[in-house]
Every structure is written in structure tokens, then in C-alpha cells.
């Protein structure tokens, strides 16, 4: 079963040393696969017809050798999907020329990507193919035949999640056709019911396997953050029970853009795949213990304490939730603020305020220690996120301290002695102000 990481995000690709580090983490987590497919490499997607030069090809063979030295399989991605004419002899020859160049270099394990494009068969192909899926399958089958059994192919479909299949994978004409025409030796990626799936359950995967006529390989975007540059995810893999594993042919995580942020994602994914009793909270505790040595301070023998590394994970937990501690503190404060004016003598208010003040102190301590760590890539990975966390919690504490002073009716916060110029502004915020959303992110107009 394929298990590991795909470098498949939109954004700046990883450096050579970052890829080596990620490979170390994959191997330590007991997984076996590294897939090279950064959108930032123009030879993968934007200029898929153009072969690598000697230096580019050497970089890939070096990565293959690095993966092999760790007992891992290395895949290279090609994404002809942006502008290929599936029936055009020149395009088909160009794709095979790319495959030949890679194969001659010993790079015979390929991923063919047809994701994030319109689900429309090009006009020029309609004389030969009766469906988009048939055209993609024909091109992919051609690649597999060309490899003559010397390599493996994984296919990423255009409909790669339940939402894109109209919520009903079994009823998707695209998936039906793909399942019936794509060579059974080619594996197929699937992200779950959503692009970023909060949960993946057995009934869903059974339906997917039925329509694809094979078990899918999960492309897990749970820790991906390329769709929201304001967030990073350092919590454990969640929302996936172990009973789904017999229904898949592999599990590949597509994690954060920032390589240094991905130790928890990789460590807990490996734990999920290996541990029959996997529990996210226990997995993240083990990940924190194993990750802490990377937080060594630049001077002396110390490191950021494990409780503060755990706080880092808690602050930047998962795409659908804050960490348990942060959730508890903010939930208690939200409840205490439901009254127009909190009573400074109310025990619930006092407890919520003290917990918030303590959270602020610990975030400040974490922020300061992170500026002093030796690993500057790790520092810069989290610096902007921690800066925002420190500023926002500081502002919240200042407001609650002001309320705790029992200000007179009609008083406004912040007063002139309060700093308030970090209020978020800009184009994105202006758009969001127009589109008023509820707590689930849904829009309502005129209600």
C-alpha cells in the first residue's frame, strides 16, 4: 500500500534540504512513498511538453536516490491537463517523450494529474472520444502501455471528491466511465467527500470503490493550507476511523506549504496507518515529544519546553477546529461575555479571565522563545502566525481587563490610551465585510 507524502501544493516548492528532511520524517513514520509534483515546477503542469534540462533531471534522480536510501518509492508527476488535446498526435507524442526522458533516467513511477480543470471535453477531441473520462483514460492507458510494465501509474481525476461528483459518486457519469475504461493497473486518487474532508467514512469509500472498480488511493488534504495563506495546521490527523483502511489502496498526505510545519502531519498520519488504537490526542503528544529537539535554542543547551510546543500545535490545530485547550478557554470566555456587562465578582468570569490571561502569557513566552531558536526555517514558518496570535490575544485581554474595571455605561473601547491600529484591513477583509457570514461560513442576504 502506498503511504507517504505528495509535494503537490500551489506555492513555492520545497528546497533540496527540505525534501530530505521530509523524507526522513516519512521514513521515521513508517511510510514508504514520496511523490514529486509541485505546481511551482513548470515542467509538471504549465509547460508539461518541455523536457527537463540536464540539471533538472539530475535533481530528480538525486531525489529518487535519496528516497531509495530510505527504503521509499519515488514518483514524478506530470499534469498535461491544462491545454492537452487528447487526440492530437503531437500532444500524445510530447507526453510520451516526457515519459521516455524520465524512464531513461530510471524515473518510471508516474502520477498523471487531471485535477483543477473544467470538466469539459475539448472541442477538438469530440470526433474521437464521447466523454471527458474516456479521453483521459485513453491518454493514461497509453502511458502505462509505453512503460511496458516497468513502472507504476497513479491517476488524479478531474472529479476527485464527492462534492465534484455532485455528492453521489455512484451516480457520476464521469466516474462510471473512468472506472470502466482506465486500466485496472492504474491507481486513482480520491480526497474524500470534500476537497478538504473533515471526515471520511466507510460507506463513502465503499461507493467510490464500486464506481471506480478499484480501491482509491486517498490524497488527504487535511493538513493542506495552500487554499488559505492565513492558516497553518500543526495538529493531529482526525476524522478518519481505522475501519476505512481496508477500503483504500494507499494513503498520501498533501500537507502544509511550509515544510517545517509538517512534522505533526506526517508523524500522526503514520501513527494512524500503523496503530490499531489510534487516538489523535495521544498521537499529537507523541509527535510533540519527537518534534521538540528541532526547537533547540541558538544559545546554550535548552529548547522550547514541550508544553509550549504542545501549545503551538493547539493554536494551529486542524482545518475544522482549534485545539482542545484553546477551544476550552475561548468557549468559557464567550459564555462569560453573553451578558451585557460581566460581573467582576462572578466566579465564572474570574476563571475565564484568568485562563485567558494565562494563555496570553504562554503565547508571549512561546513567541519570544521561537525568536531564539537555532532552526531559522522553523522560526520563520510560524513567526507570522504567532505574531497574529500574540497581537489578537493581547487585544482580547486588554478588552476583558477594561470590562473587569467596570467601565461606565456608554464607554467605548479602545480609548485613546489603547493601541488599536492593528485592526485588520485590506482588500480581502473589505470583500468579507460585504459577504456577511454565519459561524459555518455560509452567506445570508436580507435575513
Swiss-Prot record:
Optimum pH is 7.4-7.6. It catalyses: 3-O-(N-acetyl-beta-D-glucosaminyl)-L-seryl-[protein] + H2O = N-acetyl-D-glucosamine + L-seryl-[protein]; 3-O-(N-acetyl-beta-D-glucosaminyl)-L-threonyl-[protein] + H2O = L-threonyl-[protein] + N-acetyl-D-glucosamine. Gene3D superfamilies: Glycosidases, STAT, domain 1. Disulfide bonds: none annotated. Inhibited by PUGNac (O-(2-acetamido-2-deoxy-D-glucopyranosylidene)amino-N-phenylcarbamate). Transmembrane segments: none annotated. One of its GO terms (biological process) is protein deglycosylation. Residues 1-277 form the GH84 domain. Keywords: Glycosidase, Hydrolase. The active site is at 116 (proton donor). GO terms for molecular function: [protein]-3-O-(N-acetyl-D-glucosaminyl)-L-serine/L-threonine O-N-acetyl-alpha-D-glucosaminase activity; beta-N-acetylglucosaminidase activity. A protein binds at residues 8, 39, 115, 160, 219-221, 226, 254. InterPro entries: Glycoside_hydrolase_SF, Glycosyl_Hydrolase_84, O-GlcNAcase_cat. The keyword Hydrolase applies. It holds the Pfam family NAGidase. It is an enzyme of class 3 (hydrolase). Its EC number is 3.2.1.169. Cleaves GlcNAc from O-glycosylated proteins. Can use p-nitrophenyl-beta-GlcNAc and 4-methylumbelliferone-GlcNAc as substrate (in vitro). Belongs to the glycosyl hydrolase 84 family. This is Protein O-GlcNAcase. It comes from Oceanicola granulosus (strain ATCC BAA-861 / DSM 15982 / KCTC 12143 / HTCC2516).
Amino acid at each position: 500500500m502506498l503511504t507517504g507524502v505528495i509535494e503537490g501544493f500551489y506555492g513555492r516548492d520545497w528546497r533540496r534540504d527540505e525534501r530530505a528532511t521530509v523524507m526522513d520524517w516519512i521514513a521515521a513514520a513508517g511510510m514508504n512513498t514520496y511523490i514529486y509534483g509541485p505546481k511551482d515546477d513548470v515542467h509538471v503542469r504549465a509547460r508539461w511538453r518541455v523536457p527537463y534540462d540536464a540539471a533538472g533531471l539530475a535533481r530528480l534522480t538525486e531525489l529518487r536516490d535519496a528516497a531509495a536510501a530510505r527504503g521509499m518509492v519515488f514518483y514524478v508527476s506530470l499534469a498535461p491537463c491544462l491545454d492537452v488535446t487528447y487526440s492530437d498526435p503531437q500532444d500524445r507524442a510530447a507526453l510520451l517523450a516526457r515519459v521516455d526522458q524520465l524512464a531513461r533516467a530510471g524515473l518510471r513511477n508516474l502520477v498523471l494529474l487531471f485535477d483543477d480543470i473544467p470538466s469539459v471535453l475539448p472541442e477538438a477531441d469530440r470526433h474521437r472520444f464521447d466523454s471527458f473520462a474516456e479521453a483521459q483514460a485513453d491518454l493514461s492507458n497509453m502511458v502505462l502501455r509505453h512503460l511496458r510494465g516497468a513502472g507504476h501509474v497513479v491517476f488524479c481525476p478531474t472529479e476527485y471528491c464527492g462534492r465534484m461528483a455532485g455528492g453521489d459518486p455512484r451516480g457520476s457519469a464521469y466516474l462510471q466511465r473512468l472506472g470502466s475504461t482506465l486500466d485496472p493497473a492504474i491507481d486513482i486518487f480520491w480526497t474524500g467527500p470534500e476537497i478538504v474532508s473533515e471526515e471520511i467514512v466507510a460507506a463513502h469509500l465503499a461507493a467510490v470503490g464500486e464506481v471506480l472498480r478499484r480501491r482509491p488511493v486517498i490524497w488527504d488534504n487535511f493538513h493542506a493550507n495552500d487554499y488559505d495563506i492565513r492558516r497553518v495546521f500543526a495538529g493531529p490527523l482526525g476524522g478518519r476511523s481505522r475501519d476505512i483502511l481496508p477500503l483504500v489502496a494507499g494513503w498520501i498526505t498533501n500537507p502544509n506549504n511550509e515544510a517545517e510545519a509538517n512534522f505533526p502531519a506526517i508523524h500522526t498520519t503514520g501513527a494512524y496507518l500503523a496503530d490499531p488504537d489510534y487516538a489523535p490526542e495521544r498521537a499529537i503528544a507523541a509527535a510533540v515529544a519527537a518534534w521538540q529537539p528541532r526547537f533547540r535554542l541558538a544559545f546554550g543547551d535548552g529548547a522550547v519546553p514541550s508544553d509550549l510546543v504542545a501549545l503551538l500545535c493547539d493554536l494551529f490545530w486542524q482545518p475544522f477546529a482549534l485545539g482542545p485547550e484553546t477551544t476550552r478557554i475561548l468557549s468559557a470566555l464567550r459564555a462569560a461575555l453573553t451578558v451585557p456587562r460581566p460581573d467582576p465578582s462572578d466566579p465564572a468570569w474570574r476563571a475565564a479571565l484568568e485562563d485567558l490571561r494565562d494563555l496570553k502569557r504562554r503565547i508571549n513566552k512561546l513567541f519570544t522563545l521561537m525568536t531564539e531558536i537555532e532552526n531559522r526555517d522553523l522560526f520563520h514558518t510560524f513567526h507570522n502566525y504567532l505574531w497574529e496570535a500574540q497581537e489578537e490575544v493581547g487585544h482580547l485581554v486588554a478588552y476583558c481587563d477594561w470590562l473587569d474595571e467596570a467601565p461606565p455605561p456608554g464607554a467605548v473601547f479602545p480609548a485613546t490610551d489603547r493601541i488599536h491600529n492593528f485592526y485588520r484591513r485590506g482588500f480581502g477583509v473589505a470583500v468579507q465585510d460585504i459577504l456577511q457570514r454565519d459561524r459555518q461560513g455560509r452567506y445570508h442576504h436580507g435575513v
